Design a protein with these regions (language model features):
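Gram-negative outer-membrane beta-barrel domains
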Residues: 1-200
Length: 200
């Protein structure tokens, strides 16, 4: 017989989208650190698998999002041509691979999640608006709620904190007087999504 939690079991595919607010920090040796806000939108796809044990759900989930996350600090460095420039940090693709543990209240699933985050971090001065790119692997953790609203369809809202660790700006033409800087990028993501579960 079908129980109240059976509808969460199995593999699923979905779409997600949302907004991110965070910060980036540039540090060059013992020199003063530039910290500035970043923000942008995200949109992408999700794949996952749920394994319920009574009302407790264990799962794995991965997603890859196009991202417009970026930010800059004005007049933080000097280009090789001698012009003042902004230090800029960007991320144009963000992925995560996470575990999920949740509790199902019939159609409503409340969960916590955590795992790896990965994506390219672009760093450089603007002008000239050319960038070093470093692919980083960091971590992500958060929580969310998902509601099964029709058949195998569900909608979710979640919060994720993402830390992509420390990248670097090492090319003189891109980084000017900030060449050799280490650059961190952290984001607070709020996303919504729709999933379709395949019955097993």
């Amino acid at each position: 017989a079908n129980g109240p939690y059976t509808n969460w079991a199995g593999a699923y595919l979905g779409l997600n989208g949302g907004f991110g607010l965070g910060s980036s920090q540039w540090t060059l040796g013992l020199m003063a650190t530039d910290v500035f806000n970043t923000n942008g939108f995200l949109f992408g796809g999700t794949v996952g698998f749920n394994y319920p044990v009574s009302a407790v759900l264990f799962g794995l989930e991965a997603d890859v999002d196009w991202s417009s996350l970026n930010g800059s600090a004005g007049t933080c460095a000097v280009t090789t041509a001698g012009a003042t420039a902004a230090c800029e940090s960007k991320n144009n693709l963000l992925g995560t691979a996470r575990g999920r543990v949740g509790y199902a209240l019939d159609r409503t699933l409340i969960y916590v999640t955590g795992g790896a985050a990965f994506g390219p971090v672009q760093t450089g001065l603007n002008p000239p608006a050319t960038f070093d790119t470093t692919t980083k692997v960091g971590w992500a953790a958060g929580a969310g709620v998902e509601f099964a609203f029709f058949g195998n369809w569900s909608a979710k809202a979640e919060y994720l904190f993402v830390d992509l660790g420390s990248a670097s700006c090492t090319t003189a033409a891109n980084c000017g007087s900030a060449t050799g800087s280490s650059v961190t990028l952290t984001e607070n993501l709020v996303r919504g999504g729709v999933n379709y579960r395949f019955s097993w």
